[in-house]
């Protein structure tokens, strides 16, 4: 287990029941990484090594409170579950982005995409100050270690097509559907 000045790094597997299992890594202060564990694939590349997706027991909403894990990990799991159940639009748990300057500019531009809306790769490139680097935006999105929180699922192709997503296009479509459904519900209530 890694140790640094912020404390021991912990990794848990959380089963959302909606988009499958997530591997969430953090310490006492912040979340550093969220990764999708996809079935039927038996493993996922995570932190430089291949880890089995089914070896560790997964926490769920029902047993998370009993878990002896960092409070920030519990908070992240709760907020992710609320988001997936259309009860939350933004995350408030602390995160740490780690990437190149360009990647971090792209991720910050993605953080500015409102819930329920999408932007094209070209629009994100412009927002990040590099209007011709729209292909590089796709590469930066692929290196996003905090999917869901940094909403790269809200970035689409120039013709409105769904393109690449670490969790798979089916998950990207599901996340966009969740957001559009909640947005429509809110509009109907107004």
Q: Language-model features: where?
A:
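Low-complexity, small/basic-enriched stretches
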Residues: 1-88, 158-190
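Nucleic acid-binding interface residues in structured DNA/RNA-binding domains
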Residues: 7-18, 82, 87-190
């Amino acid at each position: 287990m890694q140790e640094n000045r912020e404390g021991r790094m912990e990794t848990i597997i959380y089963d959302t029941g909606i988009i499958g299992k997530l591997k969430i890594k953090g310490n006492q202060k912040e979340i550093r990484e969220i990764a999708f564990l996809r079935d039927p694939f038996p493993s996922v590349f995570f932190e430089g090594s291949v880890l089995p997706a089914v070896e560790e027991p997964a926490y769920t909403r029902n047993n998370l409170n009993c878990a002896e894990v960092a409070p920030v990990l519990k908070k992240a799991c709760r907020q992710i579950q609320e988001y997936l159940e259309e009860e939350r639009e933004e995350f408030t748990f602390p995160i740490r982005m780690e990437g190149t300057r360009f990647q971090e500019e792209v991720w910050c531009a993605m953080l500015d995409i409102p819930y329920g809306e999408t932007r094209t790769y070209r629009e994100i490139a412009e927002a990040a100050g590099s209007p011709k680097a729209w292909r590089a935006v796709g590469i930066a999105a692929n290196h996003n270690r905090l999917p869901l929180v940094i909403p790269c699922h809200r970035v689409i192709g120039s013709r409105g097509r769904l393109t690449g997503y670490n969790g798979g296009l089916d998950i990207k479509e599901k996340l966009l559907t969740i957001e559009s459904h909640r947005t429509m519900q809110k509009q109907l209530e107004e």
